[in-house]
Regions:
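Juxtamembrane intracellular "pre-TM" segments in multi-pass secondary transporters
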Residues: 1-3, 183-217
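Short amphipathic helix-loop junctions that connect adjacent transmembrane helices
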Residues: 25-39, 231-247
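Conserved MFS/SLC helix-loop-helix module at the cytosolic interface between two early adjacent transmembrane helices
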Residues: 53-92
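Helix-to-loop junctions at the C-terminal end of transmembrane segments
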Residues: 56-67, 262-276, 360
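Cytoplasmic helix-loop-helix junction between adjacent transmembrane helices
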Residues: 98-137
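Helix-loop-helix hairpin linking two adjacent transmembrane segments in secondary transporters
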Residues: 132-180
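C-terminal membrane-cytosol helix-exit motif in multi-pass small-molecule transporters
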Residues: 170-188, 382-386
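C-terminal transmembrane helical hairpin of 12-TM major facilitator-type secondary transporters
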Residues: 262, 277-321
């Protein structure tokens, strides 16, 4: 029964993130159509992660108290509403409203990871979390391409309503899948136990659980550099090599493919041989090597190699570290733990885009990637500290 639950969860995660990914590349063009300055555009992206950062621990606690299914359904409903607001936006304030609502309602990822943890034995948890990570990667991989096709190539006549409606319909479809195919994974007994226990906030949880604190810090460092890469790569590629959107899109598609392959299959093969701690460490080293390679790349081939290393590194680190984090939870507070852990990544996605531009302008085109490599390396120490203090 437990293995049967992972298939529908995978499908729900793909469809959910696909709807989100469809609209990601369209927001800059929508903001430009409304005359938004670059700083305002950055803020539109950052406000989503900021709201997600605030809300994720709350969603995690609610999923422990009321179950995973209600949180998934509520989050998908909020996402559907935010897509409609975005598609029919009449100004920049509408864009902000959409992203704020979407960020506050983004409890889906933490709930999906908690669900996968619920239905997986400890020895298979990394593989199950990797499967959810792969589903998220597929959504991010296919979404932007589909969004571009739906909107059209001519920016003067591009339709933003069509992609938004498709995204909203995907959310409704995902709600139906959760309702009819996903049984509740958080048992009534666990929920009753959670209701009678003292509530622990995210900061207190990090203080009381050193291993979780170290893992969350490692995730923050890695995700920060990932956000730097994603936010500045197109500008770097244009100015250094003259790469257009098609080439950049192909390169980022390849990065996402490798990350998905690692999370969906590579982790399943490597964790039994290496363990989560060693695989997470190798993931950090590979990601750092990829960032350095991109920074010094003299041509398209080396750039592709660097991005390939980044994809493999991130795809190795994320499910391994998530599995280690889930092991710091008791059965009654797994959602809270995963929500707290995911908040560190949300914080990194707030900070990364805001600093990549100034670093690029002040220190040169390759500097953001080199700074990212230096920031990421200490994650190895935090991983090993987490292993030493793990439950």
């Amino acid at each position: 029964m437990r293995n049967k639950q992972l298939g529908p969860l995978f499908l729900v995660s793909v469809i959910d993130i696909l709807g989100f990914g469809i609209l990601i590349p369209l927001v800059p063009y929508m903001a430009d159509r409304f005359g938004a300055a670059p700083a305002v555009l950055t803020a539109i992206f950052g406000v989503y992660s900021l709201c997600q950062l605030i809300a994720a621990p709350l969603w995690g606690r609610l999923s422990d108290r009321f179950g995973r299914r209600p949180i998934l359904i509520s989050s998908l409903t909020g996402a559907c509403a935010s897509y409609i607001i975005l598609g029919f936006a009449q100004g920049v304030d509408w864009l902000f409203a959409s992203r704020i609502l979407g960020g506050f309602m983004a409890g889906n990822i933490a709930a999906a990871f908690a669900y996968a943890s619920d239905v997986s034995p400890p020895e298979k948890r990394a593989a199950s979390l990797g499967m959810v990570g792969a589903a998220i990667g597929i959504g991010f991989m296919l979404g932007p391409a589909i969004g571009g096709l739906l909107a059209g190539n001519d920016l003067r006549t591009a339709s933003f309503v069509r992609p938004a409606v498709v995204s909203a319909c995907l959310s409704l479809f995902a709600i139906a899948l959760v309702t009819f195919l996903l049984p509740e994974s958080n048992t009534a007994e666990r929920r009753r136990e959670h209701a009678t226990r003292e509530r622990v906030g995210p900061l207190r949880m990090l203080v009381e659980r050193p291993a979780l604190r170290f893992l969350a810090t490692a995730a923050l460092l890695v995700t920060f550099s990932q956000a730097v890469l994603e936010s500045i790569f197109a500008l770097w590629a244009l100015n250094k090599f003259g790469f257009g959107p098609r080439t950049v899109g192909l390169l980022m598609f390849c990065l996402a493919c490798l990350a998905v392959l690692m999370q969906g299959g590579g982790v399943r093969l490597l964790v039994p041989r290496l363990g989560e701690g060693k695989l997470a460490t190798l993931g950090v080293l590979t990601f750092v090597a990829g960032l350095v390679t991109v920074a010094v790349a003299p041509n398209l081939v080396m750039t592709g190699l660097g991005l390939a290393l980044c994809g493999i590194g991130v795809g190795s680190f994320n499910p391994s570290a998530s599995s280690l984090a889930s092991k710091q939870a008791d059965v009654h507070d797994r959602g809270s733990v995963m929500g707290t852990y995911q908040s560190s990544s949300s914080l990194a996605r707030v900070i990364g885009p805001f600093v990549s531009g100034p670093i690029y302008a002040a220190l040169g085109p390759g500097a953001p990637f080199l700074v990212g490599a230096c920031v990421t390396l200490p994650a190895i120490w935090f991983i090993w500290r987490a292993r030493a203090r793990s439950r």
